[in-house]
């Protein structure tokens, strides 16, 4: 193993490691903080919020199925960036890769700010920057160490959730709160709620970016995605039902941490501090895995000369793309020190959905050319693609405009660089 742009990543991870990485990415700050904003978007309707959760899960399942199928066919680092290049062409691949890098880098900043707010609410950027610096060092140390740390964080979060849900439900749930005010939701509100809850599921893409680092990827990635997604869906459904059953829709919509408030309203309010701790730990766990995924995508793009070549260097000691991880860490630190949570989320939302849209389009195109395809492959990819586009349209216009502007800047930059390169290669020049 050498530190060169042609180096290969090590296949160190098994099924359990891949599942843990996916859970670490999905059981992040969203499980504690996404329910409130989603409830506010949906309106005073518990059935509407449950419908939004179901819609988010449907889109996530279609996306996960498409990405898992492609990851087995193309066991490379980079996720939909690699799939887009192979199945649709270089421009599609670049669009997916750039969308992932931009969206998930902004997500890293948002996640770090959530953790920072739990530690130092008045100045969240300071502890957020410290956490990013520490986790940058961990990602440079190698994916096995990253998976071990993530496993510890996942166990802690699951224990906190189990205790918190039991404590919140200990005083009983109001069944009428889960069935009343069905007419309070609007279609747009449900779609916006689904868009917010979707990002809580979105970490399964992290498993796909491990295509070059898992053993037997064609079998392992699909199983890992399925296990992680089902686990997270059960957890989110439990959180939504308990929170609505204790607080009702109005209080849930106004809460920054609904599960914490539900515990505080139960028979053991002293356990509410566990939710605050759990939110910080969950944010740190997802931060670690998402940062690693961004670095792997940057590595893949640098190998293909879509990003600067030094980003493809692999450390001979750890087997990690250390340069890419250092650059990602530096950008995220700058982000947490210069922007707020709302700005970070606005920059990430559109990018993530564009990434998954390309993945579904690639899966749809692949299935159309493959005589051995299963009958469900194209319909699943079509539903996933349509779901991504609908959720983008349902997002607040300002968020869509900001995300598309950054994506357009990247595409324009690529076009300019390609034009300059073509001119240099033209006869009579140089």
Annotated model-derived regions:
Residues 116, 124-173, 184-185, 225-229, ...:
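Membrane-interface loop-to-helix entry segments
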Residues 4-9, 50, 151-277:
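Helix-loop-helix junctions that connect adjacent transmembrane segments
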Residues 1-36, 40-47, 60-61, 65, ...:
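Membrane-interface "cap" regions at the ends of multi-pass membrane proteins
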């Amino acid at each position: 193993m050498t530190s060169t742009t042609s180096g290969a990543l090590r296949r160190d991870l098994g099924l359990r490691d891949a599942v843990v990485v996916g859970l670490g990415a999905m059981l992040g700050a969203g499980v504690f903080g996404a329910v409130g904003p989603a409830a506010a978007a949906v309106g005073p309707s518990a059935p509407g919020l449950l419908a939004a959760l179901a819609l988010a899960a449907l889109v996530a399942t279609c996306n996960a199925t498409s990405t898992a199928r492609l990851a087995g066919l193309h066991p490379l680092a980079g996720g939909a960036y690699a799939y887009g290049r192979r199945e649709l062409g270089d421009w599609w691949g670049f669009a997916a890769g750039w969308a992932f890098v931009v969206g998930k880098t902004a997500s890293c900043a948002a996640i770090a700010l959530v953790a920072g707010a739990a530690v130092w609410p008045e100045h969240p950027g300071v502890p957020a920057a410290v956490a990013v610096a520490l986790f940058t060092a961990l990602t440079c140390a190698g994916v096995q160490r990253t998976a071990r740390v993530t496993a510890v964080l996942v166990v802690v979060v699951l224990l906190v959730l189990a205790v918190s849900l039991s404590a919140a439900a200990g005083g009983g749930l109001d069944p009428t709160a889960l069935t009343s005010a069905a007419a309070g939701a609007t279609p747009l509100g449900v779609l916006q709620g689904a868009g917010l809850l979707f990002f809580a599921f979105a970490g399964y893409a992290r498993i796909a970016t491990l295509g070059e680092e898992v053993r037997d990827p064609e079998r392992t990635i699909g199983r890992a995605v399925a296990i992680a997604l089902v686990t997270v869906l059960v957890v989110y459904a439990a959180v939504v039902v308990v929170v609505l059953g204790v607080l009702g829709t109005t209080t849930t919509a106004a809460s920054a941490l609904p599960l914490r408030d539900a515990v505080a309203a139960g028979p053991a309010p002293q356990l509410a501090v566990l939710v605050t701790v759990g939110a910080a730990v969950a944010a740190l766990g997802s931060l670690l895995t998402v940062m690693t995924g961004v670095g792997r995508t940057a590595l893949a793009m640098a190998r293909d000369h879509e990003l600067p070549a030094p980003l493809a260097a692999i450390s001979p000691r750890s087997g990690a793309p250390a340069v890419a991880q250092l650059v990602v860490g530096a950008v995220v630190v700058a982000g947490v020190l210069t922007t707020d949570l709302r700005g970070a989320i606005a920059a990430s939302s559109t990018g993530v959905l564009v990434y998954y849209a390309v993945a579904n389009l690639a899966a749809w195109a692949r299935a159309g050319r493959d005589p051995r395809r299963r009958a469900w492959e194209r319909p699943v990819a079509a539903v996933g693609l349509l779901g991504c586009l609908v959720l983008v349209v349902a997002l607040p216009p300002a968020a869509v405009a900001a995300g598309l502007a950054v994506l357009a800047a990247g595409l324009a930059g690529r076009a300019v660089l390609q034009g300059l390169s073509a001119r240099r290669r033209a006869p009579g020049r140089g």
